[in-house]
Amino acid sequence: MPTLYQSLLKYNNSDVKALYFEGNSYTFKQLLVRVRQAAAYLKDKGIHKGDVVTTVLPNLPITVYLFYALDAIGAVQNIVHPLTPAEKILETMTETGSRHAILLETLYGENRQLFEGSEHTFFFVNPMYDKSPLHRRLFYLKYKRAKESERIFKADKFRAYPEEHCIEHRDERENSVYLHSGGTTGVPKVIALSDASLNNLAAKVDGIIEGDVKGRSMLAVLPSFHGFGLGMGIHAPLYNHAASALMMKFDCKKVVRWINQNKVNMIIGVPLLYQKLLKDGGFLDARLENLDYCFIGGDNVPPSLISEFNDVMRSHRSGAMLLEGYGLTETVTVCCVNTKAAFKDGSVGRPLRGIDITVRDSQLRSLPAAVTGEVYVKGDTLMNEYLSDPQATGMTLVDIDGESCVRTGDLGYLDGDGFLFLKGRMKRVFKISGINVYINRREIE
């Protein structure tokens, strides 16, 4: 199986749109040139195969370039919330063995002494770089410009580098991405994923979405520091020759504009996102026939939200439906989802192709249909481990009949047709599909 970067190489000469951001668009050909330039830049600045690099960025084009560039050179990516304070960033770097970090330049001014006194290497990104020269200049009226030194660099300068074609070989099953989550017990964990798990998820899109998605576009407003945003908002579309419409922060007006311009055809979101859209007059008057698919994951998705949204779609003669799914970061993200062809009210759908979901009792005995127990997930998208925590890993990745399964901590049952119905959590507050509850508010408002 290819690495994340290699999975895009078949589109190396494609003029199909890969990214939308603000008023700009980038083809796959342009994207991959930028990825190779970024790889050359990072290697020149001392990042090599096996290095752990902490990235602390919102959904920007450079975030995508760097994601695939770091994968191409064989680095491991520790992806962190972009609003994380500087001191906490240094803590997570220590926790994950990271010597390099890529950050927003907004952090530099107030933390200059902290960064300059550190033994780590820091790369700073101007978030306005992909807007206009005026936006970039206005940014520096508000924020201090990072002063380059032996250990402080301006990541935006990668564009001046030639493409790096010497790509490092890596085992697609080894740790390549670290995501931070509450784990299945609510205690903070670093979840180690592989290129194989992310690619295997992306390869299942044809079992979720009917027809060819080439040339279509997914709204990527959920953050890349969680599996839902990274796996389904960014990598899955690109893997399948579709575009990712990047948005740093949810904005109804921008979403409506992109729908009207046919730049968003698919949406993944949490309940609050769809509630906000339904309250927006612009959305209700938008060209909703441009929408093909809308997916929702969340704690206690109200049935009324799904029915209201689907009524609006029907009234606009849109083929889209709001389809509820389920997953967790330990399986990258979604492992079970309703589809247009297989849908049941109140259910989170059937398992994806290659994923096996069972419901078991406390003795790990499989339970019959309609009997509630703990949900277990088996398949090719599972995490490798909780980093540096073999005890917690052993409690979550359990051996059943010689195969590794994720013990989710979620209660539910399967009906006679294989649809999963969730009933709650065993030990803690219910967790959104691969995203902790706080995303419902902080990431959408």
Regions found by a protein language model. Give the residues of each.
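Conserved AMP-binding/adenylate-forming
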Residues: 21-24, 39-84, 221, 436
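Conserved ATP/PPi-binding loop(s) of AMP-dependent carboxylate-activating enzymes
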Residues: 343, 350-354, 365-397, 435-438
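AMP-binding/adenylate-forming catalytic core of the ANL superfamily
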Residues: 63, 84, 92, 101-106, ...
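Conserved pre-ATP/AMP-binding loop-to-beta segment of ANL
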Residues: 144-180, 187, 210-217
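Gly/Ser/Thr-rich phosphate-binding loop
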Residues: 265-269, 278-344, 356
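Structural core segment of the AMP-binding/adenylate-forming
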Residues: 44-45, 72-158
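Conserved AMP-binding/adenylation subdomain of ANL enzymes
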Residues: 199-217, 225-266, 276, 280
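Conserved AMP-binding A3 loop
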Residues: 27-29, 167, 176-200, 338
